[in-house]
Amino acid sequence: MVAEAKPFIERYGIKKVEGFFSPLPCELYEGEVNGATLNVVLNGQQQDSDLIGCEAASVATLSAIQRLHPDIVVNSGTCGGFQKNGADIAEVFIGNEVMFHDRRVPGDNTWGTQSLGNYPVWEGSQALAKALGMKMGKVTTGSSLDMQPCDLEIIEKHGGELKDMEGAAVGFVCSLFHTPILYVKSVTDLCDSGAETFEEFSRNLHKACESLKVANEKVIDYLVNNLHA
């Protein structure tokens, strides 16, 4: 979303590349950080609102990898967390695993296993989190902002901690291209707080995006220094 990316874009002063993905709605912002190329890709907009969810994220990721050939993809955005796991509003986590939580397909080791995803994350994620003093958690993805009891059942069964709407879709595309992916997630709402999800999300979005900006700066500096050393 623009709200998630804008503070980061403004921090680095990177510029929009008009029409790069045309006719697709995805948007590219490009710049340089300490000699490394930094590309920020947004899903784009339709009907005057940000495109969110798995479909838009898949299109943007596929297009970006095919056109830009990145060394690593960073899926940076907001998420829901759980009080019982120690999450706080605007706290930023690094993802250590990723899967879908709303694909209810029977059949272990066939469609059921495939539908959950469990795609690989960048092997350097743990070292980065340790170096930056950030917690880690398992990202689970669904196509709705709220969470149904059946979603929670899957999340708890598989140890999910960070609930979003795009992460596993991005991970799926990255797995097809064998492109490393790093997850950086800032908490906007606490799924077990009893508060209405959209209201809590809206109330905390700005705060979460500001903390995400700070974390992104640290992450980019780390990646530039370690991937291009």
Question: Residue locations for each model-derived region?
Answer:
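A structural motif corresponding to the C-terminal end of an alpha-helix
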Residues: 33-37, 68, 128-134, 170-179, ...
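Active-site rim beta-loop-alpha module in soluble metabolic enzymes
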Residues: 107-162, 168-177
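Active-site-adjacent mobile loop/cap segments within catalytic or ligand-binding domains
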Residues: 154-163, 168-206
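His/Asp/Glu-rich mid-to-C-terminal helical/loop segments that flank catalytic regions of hydrolases
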Residues: 193-229
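Metabolite-binding pocket within alpha/beta catalytic cores that recognizes anionic/polar moieties
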Residues: 1-119
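Conserved active-site and cofactor/substrate-binding residues in soluble primary-metabolism enzymes
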Residues: 3, 52-59, 68, 165-168, ...
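Short, well-ordered amphipathic alpha-helical segments that serve as non-catalytic structural scaffolds
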Residues: 60, 64, 122-125, 208-219
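Glycine-rich beta-alpha junction loops
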Residues: 80, 98, 143, 188-190
